[in-house]
Amino acid sequence: DTDPGQILAVFANLASDSPKNGFTIGITDDVTGLSLPSLPYSGDASGVFSCKFWGLGGDGTVGANKNTVHIVSDLSGMYGQAYFEYDAKKSFGVTKSHLRFGKAPVDSSYYVKKADFIACHNQTYIGQYDIVSELKEGGIFLLNCSRTGEELEAWLPDGVKRTLAPPPAAGSGPPAPPRVPPPR
């Protein structure tokens, strides 16, 4: 997936006093040293709500998200866009659904890098992938799991809890622990 930050790096290279004649983007090429580091990019246009869903191949996440884009677009009058990423295994491999919604046409030809909403439909992914770092500040994270609130508090990795914890108010001391909803 080539994203805008990588394209910005190409233009910055071309505008530099000594541009690299041959280069790579999207990878860190530690053998040739020809990689251009990706430049910061603020993300989607304003008014675009971006979502990322992590699923397991065959669990229905991708199919449900294909339907979601159609339903939201048809019933709300909003524009929708969806890209789907599949593991080579297909069944039982990792799937990622990248959805965007906006009041104007959504024209982002790359995967969601920072999302307003992230859902993880396979609880084992929390320990395997850095999912919550892709959440925008103030975003919503939904973990589909079978644990109670107390079990979840004990089970979640500390790094995940720190990322999801609300930022402390100025001068209020250490951050508060994350809020875990009570079991239903």
Regions from the PLM with identified roles:
Residues 1-44, 170-171, 179, 184:
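Peripheral docking tails and interdomain loops at the edges
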Residues 1, 45-57, 61-184:
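Active-site cofactor/cluster-binding pocket
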